[in-house]
């Protein structure tokens, strides 16, 4: 089991005060399991309120099982505007494969709560599990479209050094121990689809999600309701980065995926 050292609430608050003095307006909390420790999260956001830190915050990698109306209300008061959830898949068997310890109903409830409370809600999905098929992809894309999300990202699966997926692939001889990041690719017997095919499927998912008139209308209403066209600006930025950015992503990844031993 991996060990980690968390920062104290006091330490984070002090850094935020420094950033505010330096003129920063927006801060993103980058944490692979943000809100996992609810007690610490409550102390952090209450501390932000008590210290009168007037900034906007983006919370990344929010856990579905950490979704709580009281906690979300406190986060809203503290200045959190965006919540990003790692949802991974619209298929229960794939969620189980990734050991997500959640289900589709809990995911839907978490996204509904986030949307209800007015957060700009982002969901990320991973495509390319070893046994994932076209039907799985279609189900995930349709599941994403059925949720009240303000933004999505469909990304190809990557095997990262030290992860269970990576360790298993190394033991099976599919990945060298010197390769620190490897993307799913049937050319290497990592799944049923080539990396290029996965990128194409991700692009398809983005087009289907963002090109819906109902989605565009909903975001316009949300921008007006919040009297904050930052929502709309976020959409425009995310729209172009997701629709067109993945083509650049393809060229970038091929240059950076492997470690030169």
Question: Can you say where each PLM-predicted feature lies in the sequence?
Answer:
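Radical SAM [4Fe-4S] cluster-binding motif and immediate context
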Residues: 1-122, 127-129, 136, 142
């Amino acid at each position: 089991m991996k060990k980690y050292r968390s920062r104290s609430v006091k330490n984070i608050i002090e850094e935020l005060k420094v950033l505010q003095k330096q003129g920063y307006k927006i801060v993103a909390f980058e944490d692979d399991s943000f809100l996992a420790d609810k007690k610490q999260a409550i102390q952090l956001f209450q501390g932000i309120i008590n210290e009168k830190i007037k900034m906007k915050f983006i919370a990344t990698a929010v856990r579905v099982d950490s979704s709580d109306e009281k906690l979300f209300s406190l986060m809203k008061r503290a200045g959190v505007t965006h919540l990003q959830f790692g949802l991974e898949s619209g298929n229960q068997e794939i969620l189980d494969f990734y050991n997500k310890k959640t289900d589709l109903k809990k995911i839907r409830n978490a996204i509904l709560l986030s949307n209800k409370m007015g957060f700009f809600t982002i969901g990320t999905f991973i495509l390319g599990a070893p046994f994932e098929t076209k039907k799985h992809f279609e189900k995930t894309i349709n599941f994403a479209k059925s949720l009240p999300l303000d933004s999505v990202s469909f990304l190809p699966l990557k095997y990262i050094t030290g992860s269970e997926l990576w360790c298993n692939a190394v033991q099976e001889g599919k990945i060298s121990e010197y390769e620190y990041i490897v993307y799913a690719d049937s050319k290497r017997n990592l799944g049923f689809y080539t990396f290029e095919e996965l990128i194409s499927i991700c692009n398809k998912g983005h087009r289907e999600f963002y090109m819906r008139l109902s989605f565009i209308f909903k975001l316009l209403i949300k921008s007006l309701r919040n009297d904050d066209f930052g929502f709309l600006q976020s959409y425009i930025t995310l729209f172009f980065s997701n629709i067109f950015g993945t083509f650049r992503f393809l060229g970038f990844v091929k240059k950076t995926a492997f470690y030169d031993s």
